[in-house]
Amino acid sequence: MTTTGYIGTYTKKEGKGVYRFQLDEETGKITEVKTGYELEASTYVNQHNHFLYAVTKEGDDCGIASLKIESDGTLSLINKCLASTAGNGCYVSASPDGKYIFEAIYGAGLARIYEANPETGEIVRLIQELAHDYPTGPSERQEQPHVHYLNTTPDEKYVVAMDLGTDKVITYEYGDDGLKVYDTIEFEPGDGPRHITFHENGKHAYVVHELSNIVSTLKYENGHFTEIERHLTIPENFDGDTKLAAVRISHDQNFLYISNRGHDSLAIFKVGDEGATISLVDIVKSGGEFPRDFNITESDDYLVCAHQEGDYALTVFKRDKVTGNIEIVDNQETAPEGVCVQFLR
């Protein structure tokens, strides 16, 4: 079986935009990596139905590109909505019904919501650009709000934002009029919450904190979060420069994976108590430099990790579904400045 994947990249050095790759799940080898669509600053991509949405910019104009996924996995442009000059995005997602697109803007501390046509994939308009205005954290990286993630909750009723600059998670109501704050939760000063992933039961979530290298387990209910426990994602005796990046849960919901940039590793946690608790299994080297993102195949057999720096390795790990452990089976292909990994669903 061959699985198609997409890599979002920076385009500051050698990156060309969105890359498309093929993974042979019989051998665990990546058989090809090609430029899927040349797009400036396409650092995050996300799929909804037959459409792939990507953050992008042209000069000072910033926003979202909509790409059609053809039957063979190739990409063609539907349209772009470059409606702001306030900063380019770092995360993009779509509402489950495809009517809204959400974009997180790290540098300017903004949350954007767009109207989209769920039938054609066209981005119709920018509805709102909302600036976060909360007290910031104590770290020098927290000089202002920094929105790093914006996506819907499992109940589809809210949008949740991670703000690295203010140590807060904010939930919003959303609709044709834009975003309206519903609730906030504040973490420890200097945590720097970056990304979140949910257990499929919709009752628990896992937030990774970029600055403290901590993962928090949370209880979720109707737009409200409560922190349950905290775990370090790097060895306690490591004193080098490192910052946490991505978090993914295996499709069987049994294991949580987290990437550490600097330590250049993947932390593996066993999920217990129906998602309420996690326990460290191992911390494994990622196979390259600066592993900003990775993803797990639908089969749960493989994990593919992109590396932003060094030789830009695209590393394939074979997963043990029982223990959660991973082992490198392919480290030959590259994706320049790769920072986002998504598999075609």
UniProtKB/Swiss-Prot annotation:
Give the CC-aspect GO terms.
cytosol
Q: Which domain of life is it from?
A: Bacteria
One of the record's GO molecular function terms? 6-phosphogluconolactonase activity
One Pfam family of this protein, by short name?
Lactonase
- Family annotation (PANTHER family): 6-PHOSPHOGLUCONOLACTONASE, 6-PHOSPHOGLUCONOLACTONASE-RELATED
Q: Which family does it belong to?
A: Belongs to the cycloisomerase 2 family.
Name of this protein: Uncharacterized protein SSP0869
